[in-house]
Design a protein with these regions (language model features):
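Conserved catalytic cysteine-centered active-site region
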Residues: 5, 17, 56-108, 119-155
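Short beta-strand segments
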Residues: 7-8, 109-115
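Conserved active-site "lid/cap" helical segment
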Residues: 1-87, 96, 159-171
């Protein structure tokens, strides 16, 4: 197995980005990561792009996100692959990128991800998020993601306000 390194990181600015589409937002973060790695001008060395996204098809009515990102960033002929694994899509995409390099499939891969949920109402967004739970085990028994969030503090001795970054011990 070959050694693998993450050579750049990037993200969008924080705040309301509803003036941009999903691929724009992923492009901003990806360009930021490539710039951090000093590879923006040499981006054609990227052989495969792994895109983490769980809601593009439902929320944004766009399923060809990975190939759209490759085109938007002028990365052709890089292979494009969408990785959807619910709330674990990001870590799954990173695992795929790691494996592609480690096994020798590619020498250079880019992993990116993003969600754009401001295009729907709060109720539609909430309904979408509820689909992330296991339909036969969690959702049918009334478990919700906020309910899981309430379990966290007592189990790990954390203050509830720490999750929002507003209380003692927040960064």
């Amino acid at each position: 197995m070959r050694k693998v390194a993450i050579v750049g990181i990037g993200h969008t600015v924080f705040g309301n980005l509803s003036d941009f589409d999903l691929v724009d937002i992923m492009s901003f973060a990806s360009a930021n990561a490539l710039d951090d790695a000093d590879l923006l001008k040499e981006r054609k060395i990227i052989e495969q792009v792994f895109v983490a996204n769980m809601g593009g098809g439902i929320i944004n009515h766009q399923t060809g996100i990975a190939s759209a990102l490759v085109s938007r960033m002028d990365l052709e002929p890089a292979m494009a692959e969408l990785v959807e694994n619910g709330p674990a899509s990001g870590s799954s995409a990173l695992k795929c990128g790691f494996a592609a390099i480690a096994c020798g499939l590619v020498d250079v891969a880019m992993v990116t991800g993003g969600e754009l949920m401001r295009t729907v109402t709060g109720w539609k967004g909430t309904d979408f998020v509820s689909t992330l739970l296991h339909p036969e085990v969690e959702y049918n028994y009334g478990l919700t993601l906020p309910a899981f969030g309430h379990v966290y503090p007592p189990l790990y001795g954390a203050l509830r306000v720490n999750r929002a970054g507003t209380g003692p011990g927040s960064c």
